[in-house]
Amino acid sequence: MYRKILVPTMGEYMDELIEHTLDLLHGREAEVICLYVVDTSVPFLTPKKVKEMMVKELTERGKEILRDMEKGLTGPENPNVKFRGVMLEGNPADEIVKLAEEEDVDVIIMGTGKSLVDKHLLGSVSEKVVHYAPCTIHLVRTV
């Protein structure tokens, strides 16, 4: 059914995403690409040094999250999962859609992830991905 799965994550609700992905696979063979996007869209007046520190911290956090996702998705209990971690910089929604297109993924599994206030004011990443993704999307309710 699904041979290539994209799982974007910011680290929140990681367990739910792992569980949903493994449930969807039912032990079948698949490549799972976990994506962490370092969101570089900081307010315009943010000093360069502050932005650099933020990107560095987010990059370190991303490495840790991708390691944790790999541990949760692979191992002796999941021998049919081929894991690949990817870290990109940019706008999360844009990078998710772009990678889904480039990798020709079958499905994106992602959380809803933001509070109602954030969704109303900023729009959510998942909402943008739903509108522009080239494939099926499974949204995991995480709020």
UniProtKB/Swiss-Prot annotation:
Q: Which residues form a coiled coil?
A: none
Give the residue spans that cross the bilayer: none
> Pfam families attached here?
Usp (PF00582)
Gene3D superfamilies documented for this protein:
HUPs (3.40.50.620)
Q: Entry's InterPro entries?
A: Rossmann-like_a/b/a_fold, Universal_stress_UspA, UspA
User: What is the top-level taxon of the source organism?
Assistant: Archaea
Of which family is this protein a member? Belongs to the universal stress protein A family.
Name of the molecule in the record: Universal stress protein MTBMA_c15380
Organism (species): Methanothermobacter marburgensis (strain ATCC BAA-927 / DSM 2133 / JCM 14651 / NBRC 100331 / OCM 82 / Marburg) (Methanobacterium thermoautotrophicum)
